[in-house]
Structures are given as structure tokens and as C-alpha cells.
Amino acid sequence: MEMSQRTATVRDAAVLLSWRNAPQVREFSQHSDPILSEEHLEWFSARLKRIQLEPIFLFAVDNELVGMSRLDLLTEFTEKYEISILVDPGHHGRGIGSRILHMTCVSFFNLHPDKSLVARVNKNNYISQKLFSSAGFKLLSTSDDYLSFEKL
């Protein structure tokens, strides 16, 4: 499966919101309430101004968008970024998440070989736990609701 990667643009706001608000995605999100369109557009517009520092990547197969990844600089650790991955619910179960994770890690570590990636995963999201573990992320810590993984 040939997958392409590109940086998000303003044209992607609607598809990102629809993916984020899908019930299957919200179930394991850190903030499980639906996001209003106005809130999303405000956040996304501000985020696009920092896209070089904190990228959002979109992934496509045969020119159809299938998922995204986002890298957030952790302000308390300037050497760490939090990675978030989302697969279009219509494409779950096809190995797309592992391809997105791999491609994002390659892009990230090519740009930042001295930094690390951290993933916060809902304790009930066993698929994501397996995804990050299989990609070489090590369990860093646990809380009541989340597991934190890190890849150096």
C-alpha cells in the first residue's frame, strides 16, 4: 500500500473535525466531548501558525485521506514532543495506524535526532498500546486513565 504524507493546510479543517468528532475516536480521546466547529476553526487557525514547529501531517492512500498525526512540543520538556495519531474510522483495521506512526517517526527523528516522542494512550485503548509498543516506544508511566510511552 503506497501512502503519501503532507503537511496540513487550512483546507483540511473540516475533515480533521469530522474525524475527531467520530464516536469511535472520541471514545479514547483525552477530551471526549464533541468539539464545536467554531472552537475547532479557532484552534486550527492558531495551530497552522506554528505548523513548522509543531506539525500536523495528513496521510493518503490513492489520493484518499486516511489519517493524520500531530506533534505537540511539550512545554515542560523542550526536548520532547507528544505524538497523536488518528485514523479515519472508515479505514480502521487495515494497518494504517502503524504506517502513519512509522512515517511520522522517520520525519520527526530526521529533523530532531536529539529529541524524543511521548504518546499518552487511554488505558482502555489496547490497539494503540500495542501500536506504540510494537513501534519501539517504551512504557514510561501510568496513571488512572492513561499510559505514557516514549521513544528516544
Language model: regions and residue ranges:
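A short helix-loop-beta-strand connector motif used in the catalytic cores of GNAT acetyltransferases and
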Residues: S45-L58
